[in-house]
Amino acid sequence: LLGMILMESNRISDTHADGGERITVRRVKSVCTSAIGRLQSELFDLGAELACPPDKIPEFMELIDQEDSDRLCEEMDTWNEELSPLESFILPTGSGAISALHLARTVTRRLERSMVGIVDEIRPVVLQYVNRLSDWLFVLTRWITLRLGEDETLWVPKGKRDASASEMTRRQKANQ
């Protein structure tokens, strides 16, 4: 998924329809390339650790640590400075990289839930890192959505939603 996110972020046009440069897109691509690239390596580190029995982890292996978890939090704090506070849940929609980030977050949350079942066999910082990672993916998704000028799709609770699809179809037919 992370490779797909990088691919999709690189597909974003650097120019407006009028030919002008979109500087914000370069920033998004730069953040995606460096942050997602680092994340791919960190996930390989994490996978290597989880593939080993706890008492058989090689001494030379560099493990995910508190510094890695803290870095995710620092990056989230930086992006959050530009974001408006949440007023509703956000539905997973959006163009290429944004949709892929929503999917990556879902997969990460699933990983976190399954890791709870083996919590006694893993270091606490590993579960903390995965928890922060899912939050990090969410905040990055919101930040990229903002930077690209796209809209977030907010959840509308039952009772506050517009008519159903069938009702809208009936209205459209009546107006023809």
Locations of regions flagged by a protein language model:
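Phosphate/pyrophosphate-binding loop motifs in nucleotide- or prenyl diphosphate-using proteins
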Residues: 1-176
